[in-house]
Amino acid sequence: MLDVRYIRENLELVETRLKTRGTGIDLERFRQLDSQRRELLQQTETLKALRNKVSEEISRVKDKSQAQDRIAEMREVSQRVKGLDEELKGVEEALEYFLLTVPNIPSSATPVGASEADNVEIRVWGEKPHLDFTPKPHWEIGEDLDILDFERGAKLTGARFTLYKGLGARLERALVNFMLDLHTGRHNYLEMLPPFMVNRESMTGTGQLPKFEDDLFHLGEVDYFLIPTAEVPVTNIHRGEILKGSELPLCYTAYTPCFRKEAGSYGKDTRGLIRQHQFNKVELVKFVHPGHSYAELDKLLDNAEEVLRLLKLPYRVVELCTGDIGFSAARTFDIEVWLPGQDCYREISSCSNFEDFQARRASIRFREDEKAKPEFVHTLNGSGLAVGRTVVAILENYQQQDGSVVIPEALRPYMGGAEKIG
C-alpha cells in the first residue's frame, strides 16, 4: 500500500510512474477522499477540544443546577462528535479500500516497457545440452517412463492436476529436500512450515486481496483461502509486529503446495506440468532494513540461481519491465530455465523487492533501538525454486536417446544413489 502523504505530496510523479505499468490512479477520487478525511479530522478535533473545555468548566461549578445550559451544550457537542466519527470512519474505510487497489510504484531502476517483450536479459549461465536426437517434451518423457500420469490426475480431480508415480514422486521429494537443505545450510535461511490456508487479512497483507480474489481458491464456509504461494503465510508471520532492527535481516524458507485457478491462462500450456492448479514450491522470504534491501535482493537472487547451478541446468536472468512486474513489486528479476523439449526458456523463479508496500499493508515495522520511532521494513521474496518446473527441466535437459533420464549428480544422494531413471 502506498503512503497517503507520499501520494499527496507527489501526485504527478505517482501518476507518471503508475502509467508505466499500463495502469493508473484515479487522482480525482484520491483528492476527494483525502480532502474529506482531513476536513472531518479537523472538525472532529475542534469539537473534541470544545467538549473538553466545556467539561472542565462544568467540573469547576459546585452547584450543578447552575450548569445545566453547559451540560446540554456538552451533550449536543458529544452527539455531533459521534456523528462526525461515524462519517470519518466511512471515509477512512473508502480511502483504505482505494489504496488497497493501487499497485506499487515501480523502482526508478526498473526498465520501462509495455509487456514481457520489453523485459531485459541480464545474464546467461551454462551451456544448452547438445542432443544428437530430437528432444522430447517432458510430458512424453514422463509418460514413457511411467512416472507422470496426467490421465489419472485429471480423473482424480480435473484438468491441470497430475499424479506423480514411483521415481517421479521420489524426484519431486528429493528436489524439495535438496532445496531446503541448501537454503537452510549454505544460505542460512530459517525453515518454516506454515499453514496451507490463510485468512483474508493475510491475503490482503501481501497484495492478493482485494484485487485478485477471483484468481484464488476460496473456502467460503470459513472465509479461508488456499495459498497461491508460501509468500503469503510466511510474509504474514510478522503482520502487526514491531521487529528489532538488530535482528534484521530475517531470512525464511518454506516448502508448500500452491493453489492457483490460472483463470487467465485458458488454452495456454494445456499439456504437462508448466501450468497446474496445484504445484509444489520452495519459497525464500526476507524482512530487511530499507537501506539494505537491494543488496539483499541480489543475494536472494543468487541463492535461487545456485539451485540451478548445482543441478547444472542452463538458465538466464531477465529483469521485468514496468508493464510486466507484479502488483506488489517495485523491482523483479525472473530466472528462466532452458527447456530443449520446448526449445525455449521458461520462468522457474521470480525474485522481487516490494520495498515497504507489503509492510505498510501488513503493518510490519522495526525499531533501530528501543527509543527509535518504528519504521516499515522492506520485504523480499523469490522462488527457490518451483519444484514441478525443476522436474520439467531435469527431464528435458538430462534425457537420453534410449529414453532414460540421467539424475543430476547433486541430487543422487537424495535419490538413494540412483544415477538414472529408466
From Swiss-Prot:
Its main location: cytoplasm. It catalyses: tRNA(Ser) + L-serine + ATP = L-seryl-tRNA(Ser) + AMP + diphosphate + H(+); tRNA(Sec) + L-serine + ATP = L-seryl-tRNA(Sec) + AMP + diphosphate + H(+). It is an enzyme of class 6 (ligase). One of its GO terms (biological process) is selenocysteine biosynthetic process. Pathway: Aminoacyl-tRNA biosynthesis; selenocysteinyl-tRNA(Sec) biosynthesis; L-seryl-tRNA(Sec) from L-serine and tRNA(Sec): step 1/1. Coiled coil: none annotated. Its EC number is 6.1.1.11. ATP binds at residues 260-262, 347-350. The keyword Protein biosynthesis applies. Keywords: Aminoacyl-tRNA synthetase, ATP-binding, Cytoplasm, Ligase, Nucleotide-binding, Protein biosynthesis. L-serine binds at residues 229-231, 283, 383. It is found in: Cytoplasm. GO terms for molecular function: ATP binding; serine-tRNA ligase activity. GO terms for cellular component: cytoplasm. Catalyzes the attachment of serine to tRNA(Ser). Is also able to aminoacylate tRNA(Sec) with serine, to form the misacylated tRNA L-seryl-tRNA(Sec), which will be further converted into selenocysteinyl-tRNA(Sec). HAMAP family: Ser_tRNA_synth_type1. Homodimer. The tRNA molecule binds across the dimer. Consists of two distinct domains, a catalytic core and a N-terminal extension that is involved in tRNA binding. Belongs to the class-II aminoacyl-tRNA synthetase family. Type-1 seryl-tRNA synthetase subfamily. This is Serine--tRNA ligase. It comes from Geotalea daltonii (strain DSM 22248 / JCM 15807 / FRC-32).
